[in-house]
């Protein structure tokens, strides 16, 4: 699937026109005029945060499968290589495209926009090539996310933090129950797309918002761990922890209050599962648990009321 992407990048480099790029990227044409009104830059950055997060969701996938790795060092290496590769590809595709087609035309291209860009440069066969690559990419993503979604509840169940039912394996070592439940949920989502064109946009916005809180608390834990081991902490650990925490808080803010409320609705089943697991482990809920339970329930009720009243428009 990388062949069409690399071909698009090479073709855009050849066809790149700096005047076209300057007009779209800086909002200026050759005479220094401002043909477009891009509005407030910070508002634009904020509005694209969920889409940006959605692009990089799953970059931690190597960590999920770390228990199956022969060398633990490969997990960190794979994560860094994956992050840099995805970042570089998206950067080149986004920036170079603005040097080929003017910005307001790019914003009106249908999905997949990369196919239209290549067709603009080399002809209709370019669009066909990109679409073939897209099919291969979707099949690969389908396989990868099927494994990732099934592995996560399986590992958590083995650690005693999820119902033991999810830890069941077949004769080949595959987490059958975890794969069954996660794929049923995927099918329900796919069916929902038949009834509204906005289902995918709503789903990736909600999923991006939901993943922000695990990311944020992971960053907080890095700071907490560094403080607890400050005698051996390095400047690198402090820098990563603090910057990641600040960025995570900004992401939660950028996602908006409405998606925070809707995310709380997703956590309600988690409260039930958590209570069952604690009971099975013969562990009593703590005061902190009850405080978080109360906050999540209150916010979810507010979100449900706003959703039913139309105050939150998801489609």
State where each predicted segment sits.
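Membrane-interface helix-boundary motifs at transmembrane edges
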Residues: 69-73, 197, 227-234, 279-288
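A generic transmembrane alpha-helix motif of multi-pass inner-membrane proteins
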Residues: 235-315
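Helix-loop-helix connectors at the membrane interface of multi-pass transporters/channels
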Residues: 1-4, 68-72, 79-85, 142-180, ...
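Transmembrane helix-loop junctions and nearby membrane-interface residues
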Residues: 9-19, 94-101, 152, 190-197, ...
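Lipid-exposed faces of alpha-helical membrane segments in multi-pass integral membrane proteins
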Residues: 3-10, 85-92, 129-136, 177, ...
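Helix-loop-helix junctions that connect adjacent transmembrane segments
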Residues: 1-131
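TM-loop-TM module centered on a large, flexible mid-protein loop between adjacent transmembrane helices
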Residues: 35, 80-144, 162-207
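Transmembrane helix-loop boundary segments of multi-pass membrane transporters
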Residues: 129-130, 191-238, 253-268, 314-315
């Amino acid at each position: 699937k990388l062949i069409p992407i690399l071909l698009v990048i090479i073709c855009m480099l050849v066809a790149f026109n700096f005047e076209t790029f300057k007009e779209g990227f800086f909002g200026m044409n050759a005479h220094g005029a401002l043909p477009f009104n891009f509005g407030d830059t910070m508002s634009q950055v904020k509005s694209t945060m969920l889409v940006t997060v959605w692009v990089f969701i799953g970059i931690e996938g190597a960590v999920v499968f770390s228990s199956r790795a022969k060398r633990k060092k490969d997990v960190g290496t794979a994560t860094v290589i994956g992050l840099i590769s995805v970042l570089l590809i998206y950067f080149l595709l986004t920036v170079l495209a603005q040097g080929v087609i003017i910005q307001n035309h790019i914003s009106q291209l249908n999905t997949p926009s990369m196919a239209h860009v290549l067709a603009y440069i080399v002809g209709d066969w370019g669009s066909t090539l990109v679409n073939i690559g897209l099919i291969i990419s979707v099949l690969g993503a389908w396989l990868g996310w099927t494994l990732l979604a099934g592995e996560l509840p399986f590992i958590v169940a083995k650690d005693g933090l999820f119902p033991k039912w999810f830890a069941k394996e077949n004769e080949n070592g595959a987490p059958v129950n975890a794969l069954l439940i996660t794929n049923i949920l995927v099918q329900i989502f796919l069916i929902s797309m038949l009834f509204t064109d906005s289902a995918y946009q709503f789903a990736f916005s909600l999923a991006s918002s939901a993943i922000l809180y695990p990311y944020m608390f992971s960053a907080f834990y890095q700071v907490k761990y560094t403080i607890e081991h400050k005698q051996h902490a390095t400047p690198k650990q402090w820098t990563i922890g603090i910057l990641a925490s600040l960025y995570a808080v900004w992401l939660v803010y950028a996602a908006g209050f409405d998606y925070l409320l809707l995310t709380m609705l997703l956590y309600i089943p988690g409260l039930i599962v958590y209570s069952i697991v604690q009971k099975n482990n013969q562990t009593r809920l703590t005061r902190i648990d009850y405080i978080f339970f109360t906050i999540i329930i209150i916010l979810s009720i507010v979100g449900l009321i706003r959703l039913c009243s139309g105050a939150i428009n998801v489609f």
